Swiss-Prot record:
Belongs to the MsrB Met sulfoxide reductase family. It comes from Staphylococcus saprophyticus subsp. saprophyticus (strain ATCC 15305 / DSM 20229 / NCIMB 8711 / NCTC 7292 / S-41). GO terms for cellular component: cytoplasm. This is Peptide methionine sulfoxide reductase MsrB. The active site is at C114 (nucleophile). InterPro entries: Met_Sox_Rdtase_MsrB, Met_Sox_Rdtase_MsrB_dom, Mss4-like_sf. Its EC number is 1.8.4.12. Keywords: Oxidoreductase. Coiled coil: none annotated. Residues 2-125 form the MsrB domain. GO terms for molecular function: peptide-methionine (R)-S-oxide reductase activity. It is an enzyme of class 1 (oxidoreductase). GO terms for biological process: protein repair; response to oxidative stress.
Length: 142
């Protein structure tokens, strides 16, 4: 399982995960990334999303229609910047991940998890077993 110590985070990773920051749209690692695999919490290594639920949303950040496991996600009311939004945090590491909105694909439940690339690490499908995520392989065989 991939894990990262909070002290080893780069400036953007720290800003996003620990200070509730947001990385620039269209200038982040995974906004236009559609390789088969999973996205794990940058700090805890817990699986959060899969490429199977990722979709193009034109917002500039990775977007997913649902989380891999609801128990790994915490949703909180966010009233910053004069808006009311739903913040998404990881349960285990308490990392700020992004926000969830009700404007996702209707056929997939209508949600759009808008996630900062700096908060997650991508694990390619081919490396799932090797890196300790082999139990997720059946998720891709549906």
């Amino acid at each position: 399982m991939i894990k990262k110590n909070k002290n080893d985070l780069n400036e953007m990773e720290y800003l996003v995960t620990q200070e509730n920051g947001t990385e620039p749209p269209f200038q982040n690692e995974y906004w236009n990334h559609f390789e088969k695999g999973i996205y794990v919490d940058k700090i805890s290594g817990k699986p959060l999303f899969t490429s199977e639920e990722k979709f193009e949303s034109d917002c500039g950040w990775p977007s997913f229609s649902k989380a891999l496991a609801d128990e790994e996600i915490v949703e909180l009311v966010d009233k910053t910047f004069g808006m009311v939004r739903t913040e998404v945090r990881s349960e285990d590491a308490n990392s700020h991940l992004g926000h969830v909105f009700n404007d996702g694909p209707k056929e997939s439940g209508g949600l759009r998890y808008c996630i900062n690339s700096a908060a997650v690490q991508f694990i390619p499908y081919e490396k799932l077993e090797e890196l300790g995520y082999g139990d997720l392989i059946p998720h891709f065989e549906k």
